[in-house]
């Protein structure tokens, strides 16, 4: 088994009406927890790392871990560069073996976003690396990125069509009412906008900010064409909450093998639920 491009996973998902979950990773324990569940449920998976993650643990170390687990669990997986903003950074990481990258130029005007994305696409496609980009802008906070509500805006369907045609991007993250982080109230998802985007864009669509979104809402977006669902905040909250509870019950505890496993097990329940919501279980052979 090996680290593969997300395009192979997303093409199958698009053809068969399900979504591939993309779980953000932060260390060896989060990688292990996610893959334990994906192996058990035989679900394809995308492991997503932000620039902040690769500051915490080197890409080369994460890549080695993922390669080893891919062999151990006999399953292909994609290691994905999430919310990267620099061609130079992406180039270095692709040369290190990564075959999936998101270039985030959503903070730029349309023309500048197109120019940046096209430069990344030209390089990545020469390396058999798939490229995701974002049009429209999600609000909220994730990792080192913060976007206030005034700066967020939804994806225009006709602009999305032009954007894909001009850049040759492999998948498109759309802004339809979700946000990074948790919600103070139930989000208002613009399903009609998503349907209109799907009508004019044929590449796989990506839902960012899926943490804390009601399961039925996520399922509806998949019915309307979403083939990659990003989850980050819910994983961290589950892990941290379980570890905090363990220390509350074991104030003298100090063995990482115990409290890390408690956090991992809590995270695994979130992963299990998201796989069920995405409909991705039993999509890879045993």
UniProtKB/Swiss-Prot annotation:
Where do the annotations place Zn(2+) binding? 83, 180, 208
What does the record's cofactor remark say about binding?
Binds 1 zinc ion per subunit.
One Pfam short name: F_bP_aldolase
Pathway(s) this gene product operates in, as recorded in its UniProt entry:
Carbohydrate metabolism; D-tagatose 6-phosphate degradation; D-glyceraldehyde 3-phosphate and glycerone phosphate from D-tagatose 6-phosphate: step 2/2
UniProt cross-references to CDD domains, sorted A to Z: FTBP_aldolase_II
Q: Which InterPro entries match?
A: Aldolase_TIM (IPR013785), Class_II_FBP_aldolase (IPR050246), FBA_II (IPR000771), TagBP_ald_KbaY (IPR023788), TagBP_ald_KbaY/GatY (IPR011288)
GO cellular component labels: catalytic complex; cytosol; protein-containing complex
* Domain of life of the organism encoding this protein: Bacteria
Its keywords, alphabetically, are: Lyase, Metal-binding, Zinc
Question: What top-level class of enzyme does the UniProt entry assign?
Answer: lyase
Any Gene Ontology biological process: carbohydrate metabolic process
Q: Which residues bind dihydroxyacetone phosphate?
A: 181, 209-211, 230-233
The prosthetic group or cofactor this protein requires is:
Zn(2+)
- GO molecular function terms attached to this record: identical protein binding; tagatose-bisphosphate aldolase activity; zinc ion binding
Q: Where is the active site?
A: 82 (proton donor)
Q: What is the reaction catalyzed?
A: D-tagatofuranose 1,6-bisphosphate = D-glyceraldehyde 3-phosphate + dihydroxyacetone phosphate
Q: Which HAMAP family match?
A: TagBP_aldolase_KbaY (MF_01293)
Q: What does this protein do?
A: Catalytic subunit of the tagatose-1,6-bisphosphate aldolase KbaYZ, which catalyzes the reversible aldol condensation of dihydroxyacetone phosphate (DHAP or glycerone-phosphate) with glyceraldehyde 3-phosphate (G3P) to produce tagatose 1,6-bisphosphate (TBP). Requires KbaZ subunit for full activity and stability.
Q: Into which family does the record put it?
A: Belongs to the class II fructose-bisphosphate aldolase family. TagBP aldolase KbaY subfamily.
Subunit-level organization: Homotetramer. Forms a complex with KbaZ.
Extract the NCBIfam families matched here: cbbA, PRK09195.1, PRK12737.1, PRK12738.1, tag_bisphos_ald
Full protein name: D-tagatose-1,6-bisphosphate aldolase subunit KbaY
Name the source organism. Escherichia coli (strain K12)
Instruction: Cite the source lineage.
Output: Bacteria, Pseudomonadati, Pseudomonadota, Gammaproteobacteria, Enterobacterales
